[in-house]
Design a protein with these regions (language model features):
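Active-site nucleotide/adenylate-binding loops and adjacent lid/helix of ATP-dependent enzymes
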Residues: 12-13, 17-25, 30-37, 46, ...
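Short, compositionally biased "basic patch" segments
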Residues: 35-41, 66
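N-terminal ordered "arm"
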Residues: 42-48
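N-terminal glycine-rich "phosphate-gripper" loop used for MgATP/nucleotide binding
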Residues: 51-97, 104-113
Length: 190
């Protein structure tokens, strides 16, 4: 049996001075620490960079990225952009992409993954199985939406959210209508 930390059939990456930046607000988070540990174990030089400490400049034919006032230049970037700073983090990541640095995830990919409806549309377009989904913007469409997805009970989701936030199980049409109405009134997409 192979251990999870086994490098498997792929030879270990030889860092030889390669520089890796991990964009993360939480250097003490387990996932960030593990990325740093593995990168160092493989000989890479790695820094954790807070996405909120970046400045971006754009001029005719030129873009630049500064982190804490210093020029930002790495061979590769692993973004760990939290939901609360998605827009800013993606703006930073897009500028990094413009400079030609390799990124593990694109800014566009992060945005697509944060929108549950858009992610489902992409999966369906690529013939990946997805649960039956209905998107409503008016309370009058709730009954039809329940029928379209196969009846009760239903899972109601807001399109934006991570780690289960904005996901609700409802067993009656009355519960679904009340929930959807409340979410729509607060400006959520359902």
């Amino acid at each position: 049996m192979r251990r999870l930390d086994d490098t498997g059939p792929h030879p270990p990456i030889k860092g030889a001075g390669l520089r890796l930046a991990v964009l993360s607000r939480g250097p003490r988070l387990y996932s960030t620490r593990r990325i740093v540990e593995e990168a160092r174990r493989r000989g890479l030089r790695v820094d954790v960079c807070d996405p909120m400490k970046f400045s971006l400049t754009i001029s005719d034919g030129s873009v630049d990225v500064l982190h804490k006032g210093e020029a930002f230049s790495y061979d590769a970037v692993i973004p760990r952009i939290g939901h609360s700073i998605t827009q800013h983090g993606v703006a930073v990541l897009r500028q990094i992409e413009q400079l030609g640095m390799w990124t593990a995830n694109s800014g566009q990919g992060i945005l697509q993954s944060r929108d549950k409806l858009h992610a489902s549309q992409i999966l369906a377009r690529n013939r990946m199985p997805v649960p039956k989904t209905a998107y409503v913007r008016d309370i009058i469409d709730v009954e039809h939406a329940i029928e379209m997805v196969g009846g009760l009970p239903v899972v109601v989701k807001v399109t934006q959210g991570t780690q289960g936030d904005g996901v609700f199980l409802r067993h009656t049409a009355f519960e679904v209508r009340n929930l959807v109405q409340g979410l729509l009134l607060t400006g959520k997409s359902v």
